[in-house]
Amino acid sequence: MNILVAGATGKTGRRLMQALQDHGHTPIALVRESSDTSVLPEGAQTRQGDLTDLQEGACDGCDAVVFAAGSGADTGQDMTDKVDRKGAMRLIDLAAKSGASRFVMLSSVGADKPEKGGEMEHYLQAKQDADEHLKASGLTYAILRPVSLTDEDGTRQMLFGDDVDETAEAARGDVAAVLADAVSSDAWANKTMLMQSA
Protein backbone atom coordinates (compact mmCIF):
# COMPACT_ATOMS: atom_id res chain seq x y z
CA MET A 1 0.00 0.00 0.00
CA ASN A 2 1.07 3.58 -0.65
CA ILE A 3 0.75 5.39 2.67
CA LEU A 4 1.10 9.15 3.13
CA VAL A 5 2.58 10.10 6.50
CA ALA A 6 2.15 13.61 7.92
CA GLY A 7 4.74 14.24 10.61
CA ALA A 8 7.16 11.74 9.06
CA THR A 9 10.31 13.55 10.20
CA GLY A 10 9.19 13.77 13.84
CA LYS A 11 10.31 11.44 16.61
CA THR A 12 7.32 9.14 16.18
CA GLY A 13 6.93 9.67 12.43
CA ARG A 14 10.43 8.52 11.50
CA ARG A 15 9.88 5.30 13.47
CA LEU A 16 6.53 4.91 11.72
CA MET A 17 8.15 5.30 8.29
CA GLN A 18 10.52 2.43 9.13
CA ALA A 19 7.72 0.29 10.56
CA LEU A 20 5.64 0.77 7.42
CA GLN A 21 8.58 -0.25 5.25
CA ASP A 22 9.07 -3.31 7.47
CA HIS A 23 5.39 -4.20 6.87
CA GLY A 24 6.02 -4.14 3.11
CA HIS A 25 4.22 -0.84 2.51
CA THR A 26 5.47 2.17 0.55
CA PRO A 27 5.44 5.11 2.96
CA ILE A 28 5.45 8.60 1.47
CA ALA A 29 6.59 11.39 3.77
CA LEU A 30 4.65 14.64 3.56
CA VAL A 31 7.42 17.19 4.10
CA ARG A 32 7.88 20.94 4.10
CA GLU A 33 10.64 22.48 2.01
CA SER A 34 12.57 23.09 5.26
CA SER A 35 12.14 19.54 6.62
CA ASP A 36 15.24 17.51 7.53
CA THR A 37 14.66 14.44 5.39
CA SER A 38 17.99 12.88 6.46
CA VAL A 39 16.15 11.30 9.42
CA LEU A 40 13.94 9.26 7.09
CA PRO A 41 14.70 5.61 6.26
CA GLU A 42 16.93 5.04 3.25
CA GLY A 43 15.00 5.20 0.00
CA ALA A 44 11.94 6.81 1.56
CA GLN A 45 9.69 8.68 -0.86
CA THR A 46 8.70 12.27 -0.12
CA ARG A 47 5.94 14.60 -1.22
CA GLN A 48 6.08 18.32 -0.57
CA GLY A 49 3.26 19.80 1.48
CA ASP A 50 2.66 22.08 4.44
CA LEU A 51 -0.08 21.24 6.93
CA THR A 52 -0.78 24.94 7.41
CA ASP A 53 -1.53 25.32 3.69
CA LEU A 54 -2.30 21.96 2.11
CA GLN A 55 -2.94 21.99 -1.61
CA GLU A 56 -5.37 19.86 -3.63
CA GLY A 57 -3.92 16.52 -4.59
CA ALA A 58 -1.82 16.07 -1.45
CA CYS A 59 -3.25 12.57 -0.93
CA ASP A 60 -3.60 11.52 -4.57
CA GLY A 61 -2.43 7.98 -5.27
CA CYS A 62 -2.34 7.02 -1.60
CA ASP A 63 -4.22 4.01 -0.25
CA ALA A 64 -4.08 5.28 3.33
CA VAL A 65 -3.02 8.37 5.27
CA VAL A 66 -1.50 8.64 8.75
CA PHE A 67 -1.52 11.89 10.73
CA ALA A 68 1.40 11.69 13.15
CA ALA A 69 2.20 15.40 13.13
CA GLY A 70 2.01 17.95 15.89
CA SER A 71 2.65 21.65 16.24
CA GLY A 72 5.04 20.97 19.13
CA ALA A 73 5.07 21.90 22.79
CA ASP A 74 6.88 25.18 22.19
CA THR A 75 4.37 26.70 19.78
CA GLY A 76 1.41 28.87 20.70
CA GLN A 77 -2.30 28.29 20.35
CA ASP A 78 -2.33 29.77 16.84
CA MET A 79 0.02 27.08 15.50
CA THR A 80 -1.90 24.39 17.39
CA ASP A 81 -5.02 25.54 15.53
CA LYS A 82 -3.22 25.62 12.17
CA VAL A 83 -1.63 22.16 12.46
CA ASP A 84 -3.46 20.00 14.99
CA ARG A 85 -6.98 21.19 14.14
CA LYS A 86 -7.21 22.80 10.71
CA GLY A 87 -4.26 20.96 9.14
CA ALA A 88 -5.55 17.59 10.31
CA MET A 89 -9.10 18.37 9.15
CA ARG A 90 -7.89 19.52 5.73
CA LEU A 91 -5.80 16.35 5.35
CA ILE A 92 -8.85 14.24 6.26
CA ASP A 93 -10.93 16.04 3.63
CA LEU A 94 -8.26 15.57 0.96
CA ALA A 95 -7.87 11.89 1.86
CA ALA A 96 -11.61 11.35 1.46
CA LYS A 97 -11.61 13.26 -1.83
CA SER A 98 -8.68 11.23 -3.19
CA GLY A 99 -10.35 7.89 -2.49
CA ALA A 100 -7.99 6.73 0.27
CA SER A 101 -9.31 3.62 2.00
CA ARG A 102 -8.23 4.47 5.54
CA PHE A 103 -7.08 7.34 7.76
CA VAL A 104 -5.09 6.67 10.93
CA MET A 105 -4.92 9.47 13.51
CA LEU A 106 -2.31 9.83 16.23
CA SER A 107 -4.37 11.61 18.87
CA SER A 108 -3.78 11.93 22.62
CA VAL A 109 -4.99 10.69 25.95
CA GLY A 110 -7.44 13.30 27.25
CA ALA A 111 -8.82 14.21 23.81
CA ASP A 112 -12.18 12.82 24.94
CA LYS A 113 -12.34 15.34 27.81
CA PRO A 114 -10.29 18.44 26.91
CA GLU A 115 -12.03 20.54 29.56
CA LYS A 116 -10.14 18.52 32.18
CA GLY A 117 -6.79 19.09 30.51
CA GLY A 118 -5.66 22.15 32.46
CA GLU A 119 -2.95 23.95 30.50
CA MET A 120 -3.33 21.31 27.77
CA GLU A 121 -7.02 22.13 27.21
CA HIS A 122 -6.52 24.08 23.96
CA TYR A 123 -4.34 21.34 22.45
CA LEU A 124 -6.69 18.57 23.55
CA GLN A 125 -9.68 20.46 22.15
CA ALA A 126 -7.90 20.71 18.79
CA LYS A 127 -7.23 16.96 18.89
CA GLN A 128 -10.85 16.23 19.79
CA ASP A 129 -12.13 18.43 16.96
CA ALA A 130 -9.88 16.63 14.46
CA ASP A 131 -10.90 13.21 15.81
CA GLU A 132 -14.60 14.03 15.52
CA HIS A 133 -14.09 15.40 11.99
CA LEU A 134 -12.44 12.11 11.04
CA LYS A 135 -15.29 10.05 12.50
CA ALA A 136 -17.78 12.06 10.44
CA SER A 137 -15.73 11.93 7.22
CA GLY A 138 -16.99 8.62 5.87
CA LEU A 139 -13.44 7.24 5.81
CA THR A 140 -12.56 4.00 7.56
CA TYR A 141 -10.54 5.32 10.48
CA ALA A 142 -8.39 4.33 13.42
CA ILE A 143 -7.69 6.78 16.25
CA LEU A 144 -4.87 6.02 18.67
CA ARG A 145 -4.74 7.94 21.96
CA PRO A 146 -1.45 7.12 23.68
CA VAL A 147 -0.53 8.31 27.15
CA SER A 148 2.59 10.47 27.71
CA LEU A 149 5.21 9.69 25.05
CA THR A 150 8.82 8.71 25.69
CA ASP A 151 11.64 8.50 23.16
CA GLU A 152 12.16 4.78 23.78
CA ASP A 153 11.85 2.11 21.09
CA GLY A 154 9.66 0.00 23.38
CA THR A 155 9.23 -3.75 23.66
CA ARG A 156 5.95 -4.21 21.72
CA GLN A 157 4.29 -5.14 25.02
CA MET A 158 1.28 -2.83 25.18
CA LEU A 159 -2.03 -2.31 26.93
CA PHE A 160 -5.16 -0.88 25.31
CA GLY A 161 -8.54 0.55 26.25
CA ASP A 162 -9.79 0.03 29.79
CA ASP A 163 -6.47 -1.55 30.83
CA VAL A 164 -4.59 1.71 30.29
CA ASP A 165 -3.30 3.77 33.22
CA GLU A 166 -3.63 7.35 31.98
CA THR A 167 -0.61 8.39 34.10
CA ALA A 168 1.63 5.74 32.47
CA GLU A 169 3.93 6.17 29.46
CA ALA A 170 4.00 5.02 25.85
CA ALA A 171 7.24 4.42 23.96
CA ARG A 172 7.32 6.10 20.55
CA GLY A 173 8.52 2.83 19.02
CA ASP A 174 5.47 1.03 20.35
CA VAL A 175 3.18 3.83 19.13
CA ALA A 176 4.72 3.64 15.65
CA ALA A 177 4.22 -0.13 15.58
CA VAL A 178 0.53 0.24 16.43
CA LEU A 179 0.02 2.98 13.83
CA ALA A 180 1.66 0.80 11.17
CA ASP A 181 -0.60 -2.11 12.08
CA ALA A 182 -3.71 0.08 12.12
CA VAL A 183 -3.16 1.07 8.48
CA SER A 184 -4.37 -2.29 7.23
CA SER A 185 -5.69 -4.35 10.15
CA ASP A 186 -9.44 -4.90 10.23
CA ALA A 187 -9.16 -5.12 14.01
CA TRP A 188 -8.57 -1.36 14.04
CA ALA A 189 -11.36 -0.37 11.63
CA ASN A 190 -13.40 2.52 13.06
CA LYS A 191 -11.89 2.15 16.52
CA THR A 192 -10.70 4.78 18.99
CA MET A 193 -8.26 3.32 21.50
CA LEU A 194 -6.20 4.37 24.49
CA MET A 195 -2.72 2.85 24.58
CA GLN A 196 0.30 2.53 26.84
CA SER A 197 3.54 0.55 26.84
CA ALA A 198 3.50 -2.27 29.39
Predicted region positions:
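Conserved beta-strand positions in the Rossmann-like core of class I SAM-dependent methyltransferases
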Residues: 4, 28, 142
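Glycine-/Pro-rich loop/turn segments that contact NAD(P) or position catalytic residues
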Residues: 71-161
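Short, polar loop motifs at secondary-structure junctions
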Residues: 30-37, 146-148
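NAD(P)H-binding glycine-rich loop region in Rossmannoid oxidoreductase-like domains
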Residues: 35-90, 94-97, 112, 184
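Structural motif
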Residues: 2, 63-64, 102
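Active-site-lining helix/loop region of Rossmann-like oxidoreductase modules
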Residues: 8, 151-153, 157-198
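N-terminal Rossmann NAD(P)H-binding glycine-rich loop of SDR-like oxidoreductase domains
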Residues: 3-25
